[in-house]
């Protein structure tokens, strides 16, 4: 059992996200509120601290067939956070799928104070000259009172005037600082630098890596080198420095992923990031271990924190967590456009006895891939 870390955590909750002409998302919306209190839930405190009626989904398992946008959604969020922190418009323009059309992102989130923030960034075409376009920022906010619901706060949102000169250094003067950690392949700066006690991270690293590869029991802090650890297997030494493996070719794919998993779990235990996104990091790891480590993550999630966890593992459908914790992405081609949509298990399965696994197996959530093209490979 990991020792409890006594530390006041950071608030970071996403309530709503809208994307239009962003990567493969057109007119897309995903919402993280839920209407009804769940009795005896295994995920406690799914509401804003001291605001019991302001409910949010604290842990979300995001599923769907290949190429439905699970990883891309994480990339979009990472770049949106980049916009908030730096004001750099390139984070926005790099996401636009078709630059000849308008594009838009809109995110609602809570961080720090009990204030609902809404940031909208859009690419708008000049009405007199379609070749000209401009990026428009809009920021709205509203205070959250102890008796407020999410829906009630939406009615109070007010536009705040933005100083264009300040936009060049980011929107945090308006929104406050944001806190997050991503485990996302092929992305730089997934894990923000955080101050987790090296002894805590070492303990988590030993537990995770030692479970994935029992031959890796000798793990220690590398003396004299900041933020560095050495993993030993006999005469071999694998160095982990600044969250990156120097010679990862000596480890299995699952063990390499385990380092990112350990970083994420340590961050959650220390309550230092607030928002966490774990994207398909258990593809090379046994299903029972995925379930166990996900359980550890939600066990240590504190009030006003949030985890989005993407996976293809259908065994995750058997977890004893609320139905509203499951969301399914699907993607269809409508004319010349790719349409990505989300379906929440709780919107379809209303009875306590309804099985999410059975519903998924019967493609209720449109999450089963179309295998018809493979039929030609089986023809005589």
Language-model features, listed with the residues they occupy:
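Pre-Walker A-like glycine/lysine-rich segment at the N-terminus of P-loop NTPase domains
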Residues: 2-78
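C-terminal lobe/lid and adjacent interdomain/linker elements of RecA-like ASCE P-loop ATPase modules
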Residues: 2-16, 292-380
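Phosphate-coordinating catalytic segments in nucleotide- and nucleic-acid-processing enzymes
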Residues: 2-31, 81-271, 356-367, 376-380
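Conserved glycine(s) of the Walker
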Residues: 69, 254, 285
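Walker B motif beta-strand of ABC-family P-loop ATPases
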Residues: 275-277
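Walker B catalytic acidic pair
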Residues: 279-281
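ABC ATPase nucleotide-binding domain "signature" loop
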Residues: 283-285, 316
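Conserved D-loop-proximal element of ABC-family nucleotide-binding domains
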Residues: 286-287, 291
